[in-house]
């Protein structure tokens, strides 16, 4: 099979710049919908609907003209096809998910009302996950298809090689569970990596520790900036302002050995020292 034909599905050429790999395995699609459990009238948005493989069963289960499924899509060629296929049961938002205001779909009030799903483009998955975290207070849950390596980092425990900045920053915000493995042959064109389905449920505001998330991000970024070095080196800039001994924080460790709660404690101490 030629490279061009392998990238074509239903008359559409998958675009590398959009990270397009279309899900075609009906069994996997059914399994994904089963774990999402969409209900009629729910407020849901799909990121990157593509050719509508997941969109179709979601529309069937939850959409009405008064409460359509929402979708964010960047590829204009696909938008026309999706509009024609789903009509007023799908409300399309043309644009880049990295810049989209997901809070605008959550409705009035401050309670979580939005469910987010999608086969996320692997080339932007980490920045997109961080962008989505800014709307976590309005979100009920998220179900995503991602590169398996990314999912393993999301659910990694301290002490493992997969534990990373991504692990800390997302586990601070969400309860995260890996649900399903998805092989490359489930897609057209097949990606060069394995994939997985992950569920993310945001903690309620009262469950989150009081911490400046910008400070937390700075501390975690510094800690993981040189993974093989001890924290006494990577966090050296904080040693004048933070009493690590009083915190019970052992600097004779590497970044991947520190639980999320301890990073939060350091960030809180940094804020206290700065009077913020």
Swiss-Prot record:
SUPFAM superfamilies: S-adenosyl-L-methionine-dependent methyltransferases (SSF53335). This is Ribosomal RNA small subunit methyltransferase A. GO terms for cellular component: cytosol. One of its GO terms (molecular function) is 16S rRNA (adenine(1518)-N(6)/adenine(1519)-N(6))-dimethyltransferase activity. HAMAP family: 16SrRNA_methyltr_A. SMART domains: rADc. It is found in: Cytoplasm. It comes from Paraburkholderia phymatum (strain DSM 17167 / CIP 108236 / LMG 21445 / STM815) (Burkholderia phymatum). Keywords: Cytoplasm, Methyltransferase, RNA-binding, rRNA processing, S-adenosyl-L-methionine, Transferase. Belongs to the class I-like SAM-binding methyltransferase superfamily. rRNA adenine N(6)-methyltransferase family. RsmA subfamily. Gene3D superfamilies: Ribosomal RNA adenine dimethylase-like, domain 2, Vaccinia Virus protein VP39. It catalyses: adenosine(1518)/adenosine(1519) in 16S rRNA + 4 S-adenosyl-L-methionine = N(6)-dimethyladenosine(1518)/N(6)-dimethyladenosine(1519) in 16S rRNA + 4 S-adenosyl-L-homocysteine + 4 H(+). The gene is rsmA. Its EC number is 2.1.1.182. Its main location: cytoplasm.
